[in-house]
Amino acid sequence: MKIAVFASGNGSNFQRLAEQFPKVVKFVFSDHHDAYVLERADKLGVANASLELKEFTSKVDYEKALVEILEAQEIDLILLAGYMKIIGSTMLARYKGKIINVH
């Protein structure tokens, strides 16, 4: 199983998850290019990417690009750990039953 962690900022939840489950936490996504979670991921050797909604003409296009990234990483499960965006219909359709919000 490959897990992606979504985070919008610091990434302390991601770091705990990655340290506890290093064999399955394989990818980090952030909706901010300057989020510290990306630096944490780099330090732990976890693949990562970021996209910002303002770079796209619509949320649908944003989520389509995100789905492409996740599919390329062969992600099975998504953990929302401090992710501050609302997940839209494109993501929900593709990952139905495979998204867990961690608070």
Residue ranges of predicted features:
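One-carbon transfer enzymes
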Residues: 1-102
